[in-house]
Amino acid sequence: MIMKFFDREREINEILGILDETPDNIYFIYGPINSGKTTLMMEIINRLKDDKKYRIFYYNLRGVRISSYSDFFDIMFEIREDNKFKQMVKDADVLVEGIKFIEKTAKLFNESIILPSDLAKVILSKQKGFDVFRYLERVFREMNKKGLKPVIIIDELQRLKGLKSNGELIDDLFNFFVRLTKELHITHCFCLSSDSLFIEYVYDRAELRGRADYILVDDFDKETALKFMDFLSEDILGRKLSEDEKELIYSYVGGKPKDVYDVIIKLKLGKELKDILEFMLKEEIQKLKYFLEDVKEDDEELYNKIVDALKIFKENYEIEDIKIPKNIREFLVKKNILFLNPIEGTLKPQSFLVWNAIKKLLNGH
Ligand SMILES: Nc1ncnc2c1ncn2[C@@H]1O[C@H](COP(=O)(O)OP(=O)(O)OP(=O)(O)O)[C@@H](O)[C@H]1O
């Protein structure tokens, strides 16, 4: 079954508006886990498919192991033996011919840039004083001259976190992005992540003040979530849900697209709504319970502080960030229990399910 896309008109208009202008900023697309960031970018790519001027380079770092600088390049490029290219460059400048080659082979949507191995050898041998970013800059310049608009999208940016030399790579990568946007205005750059602490880290480290902007892709608000339920139930179940059923779903999973989708799929499999929701909640409660147990075993003092912090959410879904001491809030954000919105300065549970689990578990506290 092909997933149908729902709503997000405001975010889509904003991003299409940005793409229509000259590149001038790096954009961080952020929001809680499973809020629909990737799905939104896929929809954007889909809407651009008939517009011949865009060349989109989309890299999803999910599920790839990045332990070195060169792993990152392996993701950006697909290196292939290419005999035609060999013929082309017999006597000519490999780099110049390479640019022509990439222009020719760049499609609307590329997972990675295809590089003939002869060209890769030249680019990757830094001794020749030519590094990958400088080469790509030349490629993008040439594309611009021809009226093409390259777009780079990096999904799951936080995967760069595990890298030993990540500081270095992040500096190089974002210097490159600043050059492509603020300085040369030749390429749109978008980075997606649900890890707002990492986005903040990148922002500070790469000195992006005044050079980057943020677009929030949040879970749906209540009104939109109920409409999303109608949209999915008609499409997947072939029937409408009652108002009571929708309210019940919302009370358990809120407006998180992935959770709402999961509920509807389980309904299709013939399960009872109440059982589905109770099961999902139980799972979340168990996760949180074991997390708290581990913390308690390790450090009782920290455990007490965490319980105090989580207690604030018994009465509120969203609070001001500084209501929880920095080390505790960062710990809970890292553990994906809370979502920090560094722009608004707010904190909330990663999902309604997590919120409900907090309320259930801390009932006696
Ligand atoms: N606009 C939408 N229309 C239809 N379904 C959606 C939409 N947004 C999200 N979904 C559903 O929610 C799921 C999770 O969305 P997605 O993977 O895009 O989230 P994400 O924010 O990129 O996640 P992560 O936090 O892992 O980066 C999708 O697989 C899809 O089922």
Curated annotation (Swiss-Prot):
SMART domains: AAA. InterPro entries: AAA+_ATPase, ATPase_dom, MJ1010-like_2nd, P-loop_NTPase, WH-like_DNA-bd_sf. The keyword Hydrolase does not apply. It comes from the Archaea. ATP binds at G31, P32, I33, N34, S35, G36, K37, T38. The keyword Cell division does not apply. Keywords: ATP-binding, Nucleotide-binding. One of its GO terms (molecular function) is ATP hydrolysis activity. Pfam families: ATPase_2, MJ1010-like_2nd. Signal peptide: none annotated. Belongs to the archaeal ATPase family. This is Uncharacterized ATP-binding protein MJ0075.
